[in-house]
Amino acid sequence: MTFYDSHGIPIAYLYDNSEYIYLFNGKPVAYLYDDAVYGFNGHHLGWFENGWIRDLHGQCVFFTEESTGSGPAKPAKHAKPAKCARNARPAKSARNAKHAKAAKGLSWSSISGEVFFEQ
């Protein structure tokens, strides 16, 4: 599964439908836990529902081919780059508590691209 930003640029992918999210350069950047997206530093980054990754304010950060339901208009998708060899995953830090879910927004988040995973 590929995660595209608000411009249709492929930023990251879910490795073999596992819980781990990688950038195309091979860097592991996050993982899914239930319906939440966490950084390896333990920070709760956002939510993954219906093919959308949303920030903590409910705004859309990424979409996938499977995105359904409410959200902003999806742009045309750019071609996916080749996937580089995956780097070793860092150890997961203790997860911070999940934030309360915000109402689902219909616009794009101001946080996008790789920056989302660096929080």
Which residues are covered by each model-predicted region?
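Hydrophobic residues embedded in beta-strands of well-ordered beta-sheets
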Residues: 19-21, 37, 53
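Tandem-repeat architecture and repeat-register "anchor" residues
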Residues: 6, 24, 40-41, 56
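Extracellular beta-strand scaffolds
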Residues: 27-28, 44-45, 60, 68
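Long terminal segments
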Residues: 1-9, 50-119
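N-terminal leader/targeting segments and the first structural element of proteins
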Residues: 1-31
